[in-house]
Amino acid sequence: MVVRRRECRRVREEDAHTPTYTTALPSLEDVRAAFPVLDRLAYLNAGTNGPLARSTVEAMLAEELIDLAQGRGGEPYFSRALAMRDEVRAKLAGHLGAEPAQVALTRSTTDGCNIVLAGLDLGPEDEIVTSDVEHFGLIGPLHASGAKIVTAPEDRVIEAVTDRTRLIAISHASWVTGNSLDPLRVKAETGFPILVDGAQSAGVIPVEAGEFDFYAVSCQKWLCGPDVTGALVVARPDELRVALPSYFAQAEHEPDGSYVPREGAERFDSGWNGTPSLAGLSAALDVAPDWRFERTAEMAGKCRAALDERFEVVTNPGQAGLVTFRPETDPTELVEKLREQGVIVRELPGRNLIRVSCGYWTSDDDLERLLDGLG
């Protein structure tokens, strides 16, 4: 497939609430060359961890070498670290459809979910409605909240809402099926606050996280960032209590022990994210071309159509990113067989399912290798 180059669209200042970050719109060949792992493997597992770009690792190494030579203290060190936090926050806002002041830097989707649920102060008389296709990264924090958890089929969430509901907590795209739970419609039709697990949507489809109350993401998946990087978008930061304060929660350091929270969602930052990791994330966010969403949807559609001819596919048509199917043989053995052939996919334990992740970097050859490996 040939991907056409396109002119870089200039965003007028009055149209853009945050900076828009794109690459120089490279070809598919340029993009694939940025990810060395693609030279060897049909890497189809970004739903767990995305491939690392060479520039991501180089940015991390550069920061480590500065620390090695200059130490990790003094004004230059802290100024560089704080500037990197601001840079990454702004870039994430651009990628997630939010304002920088709405973005907290976290370590994972689960981290963000815990921050939200701890700050809501829910009790056993309160209900949280969720779906039956959620990841433990959301389910665990829900049960730790102390509220009653009401679980509904993924297409019946709205019907499960009652007058005791205090929060709806669902994924944007299910980690199991890849299907969209349409959280914007759920929010519009119920009017209740909503916490969205965006782990399988950020970097896969266009996201306007600022339209939700809370939106948590992991950056090592489809955004291809380093491990232990994440973000939480809080639409109205002043309305959520800071229940898990970190060093960055306070605006000033007062000798008398008083506490004034920082402005915006920065008050929810979950501690000191390593500057090398943030530098790597900043570089990773620059790799994604502006045609990433169209390409991801196209390759997922091709993958689904091909698998549907031979297997039971549980992913609905028209989804992007994940394609999940039920194999006719033992999934553990089949995933291992594929790995030995250089095709990386994921088994979903206990469900007799195999999940394929198609990103903007996925090629037709990757899909052919998958199909050949399936026999």
Predicted regions located by residue number:
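Short hydrophobic transmembrane-like helices used for membrane targeting/insertion
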Residues: 1-3, 11
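Pyridoxal 5′-phosphate
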Residues: 11-375
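Intrinsically disordered and other compositionally biased segments
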Residues: 4-5, 22
